[in-house]
Amino acid sequence: IASTGSPLAEESFKYVYENIKQDVHLASIAGGTDLVGCLVLGNLYSNVHKGEIQGQSLGIDVDVFTDGGKSTKDGDKGELVVKKPFPSMPVKFWGDSNGQKYLKAYFTRFKNIWHHGDFIERTSNNGFIMRGRSDSTLNPGGVRIGTSEIYQQVEDIDFITEGLVVGQDFKDDVRIILFVTTKNNQELDNEKVKSIKSRIRKNCSPKHVPSLIIKVPAIPRTKSGKIVEIAVRKIIHGEPINNKEAIANPEVLKFFENLPQLKL
């Protein structure tokens, strides 16, 4: 069984092995349409650890870099990169006659290094944990936090259907805003808000705790089913959204405009 599109939570690993089949190979995989394949993926010959992708693809020089362009240590988070050319790497973009769009997409963060745009952690098992997209990571108090770290806590709460988390610029810092939809449209009262914050604080850290938790009628998604954190972040900062046509339910974006709770 292969899973892709977003990080596979620990609880989902547990569900598969307890409810579907005990001796199945469950592989969380990650790569891209642009490279027609995976950078990190499953491996039939090594152990499956819940919450982790087992290893890197053969023939691809995958690494995890610090912001300074050095390899991270196990347990540290950083940027997913490829240090050498690989067979399925795109060579140009259609209509990009001088190659500048191509270079900007992959090679501006680190010189001559493919920067994939994912925030990732290498584990002591030689595996990887996807922490979210690089451009949607949160940075409260200068600490980088992957959005998936918060999602893994929220999706296990019985009265929540799903959530979307973004960072809002606030008083020379960033504050975390968590938007949620509730099951059967339940009210999000103070007790529920406290329970969400308590769970995140206990299982993550005080830095992960959202400053505000706001109930919304729906979460915007792309036509391929991915939640659109960047679009929501732009809306709450009053910035234009460039590719609204890629959103499956653009009508829900109106709700995020001019929210009184987010007035600075």
Model-identified regions with their sequence ranges:
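General small-molecule cofactor/ligand-binding pocket signal
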Residues: A27, D63, I213-V216
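AMP-binding/adenylate-forming catalytic core of the ANL superfamily
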Residues: F86, N112-H208, K223, I227, ...
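Gly/Ser/Thr-rich phosphate-binding loop
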Residues: I1-H49, D61, G69
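Ligand-binding pocket scaffold of soluble enzyme catalytic domains
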Residues: F13-Y15, G32, L58, L164-V166, ...
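Core-facing hydrophobic residues within beta-strands of well-ordered domains
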Residues: D23-V24, S57-I60, I160, P210
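Conserved ATP/PPi-binding loop(s) of AMP-dependent carboxylate-activating enzymes
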Residues: Q56-S57, K70-F110, P240-I241
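Short, acidic, Ser/Thr-enriched surface-loop or helix-capping motifs
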Residues: T66-D67, G75, R122-T123, R221-T222
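Short coil-to-beta-strand transition motifs
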Residues: I53-G59, W114
